[in-house]
């Protein structure tokens, strides 16, 4: 297991441009800090006033499209600092406000025992955009995201259910999915059931890729490759976070096609 100093050294490696070998980076800047300070009180008010049920036994507020930012990412007068993020501006959806409380995860009626064990033991590791549908939870590409950006909105201990990533997993996922789609016309890729190949590729990720814990810090952003396997660690005993819980705003703008999604 990585020690705290090893984690810090690894995180510092990713304060520059996204390394294609690992698939993620962390950046910081005054504009990111200003954006988080502007978004935080808005997010807190939304979460505390919301009637949306908390999942995972009352420990996770999903908060999809909860933040009322504009299409440029501006919120409460604060502009999204595209230059600090190192990204080209694109039209944005309302940000997700994901909030986790102490005790995460807990069993719930909406989740099977197997799904809960996977959440507890494997951080509910997943690939965004590959959505499970129907009673049999078969997966296809529904939301081909361009990239994923997460920005911490409040102070939280490193053990307060941090983001976790599997370095290099985007390459394994891309190779596996492309192999499954090789003989399918590109226009039909979004309709293909990719459940089995996805699960096989994810199993390989667990065996071959390094799991890295990425605690959120106000004033910093984490940029993930769209195909990177990632998840949320269980809340560590004794970890603390400001109310209403460890809070992160996420942007995942959608691309034009599945073929584009599977490009480099």
Positions of PLM-derived features:
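Non-heme Fe(II) oxygenase catalytic core, chiefly the N-lobe of the double-stranded beta-helix
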Residues: 17-20, 34-211, 235
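Short hydrophobic/aromatic beta-strand or adjacent loop that forms the aromatic wall/cage
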Residues: 22-24, 146, 246-248
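Non-heme Fe(II)/2-oxoglutarate
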Residues: 178, 223-264
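Short acidic-glycine-tyrosine-enriched beta hairpin
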Residues: 210-223
């Amino acid at each position: 297991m990585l020690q705290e100093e090893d984690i810090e050294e690894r995180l510092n490696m990713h304060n520059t441009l996204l390394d294609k070998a690992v698939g993620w980076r962390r950046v910081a800047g005054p504009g990111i800090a200003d954006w988080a300070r502007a978004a935080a009180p808005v997010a807190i008010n939304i979460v505390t006033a919301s009637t949306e049920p908390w999942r995972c036994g009352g420990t996770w507020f999903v908060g999809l499209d909860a933040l009322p930012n504009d299409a440029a990412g501006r919120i409460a007068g604060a502009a999204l600092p595209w230059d600090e993020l190192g990204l080209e501006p694109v039209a944005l959806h309302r940000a997700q406000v994901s909030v986790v409380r102490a005790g995460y995860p807990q069993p719930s009626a909406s989740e099977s025992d197997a799904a809960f064990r996977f959440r507890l033991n494997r951080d509910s590791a997943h690939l965004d955009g590959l959505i499970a549908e129907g009673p049999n939870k078969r997966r296809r590409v529904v939301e081909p995201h361009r990239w994923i950006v997460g920005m911490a909105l409040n102070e939280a201990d490193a053990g307060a259910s941090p983001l976790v990533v599997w370095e290099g997993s985007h390459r394994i996922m891309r190779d596996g999915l492309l192999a499954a789609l090789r003989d399918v016309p590109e226009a039909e890729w979004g309709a293909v059931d990719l459940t089995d190949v996805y699960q096989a590729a994810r199993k390989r990720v667990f065996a071959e890729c390094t799991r890295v814990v990425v605690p959120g810090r106000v004033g910093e952003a984490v940029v993930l490759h769209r195909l990177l396997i990632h998840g949320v660690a269980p809340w560590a005993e004794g970890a603390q976070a400001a109310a209403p819980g460890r809070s992160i705003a996420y942007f995942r703008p959608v691309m034009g096609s599945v073929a584009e999604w599977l490009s480099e």
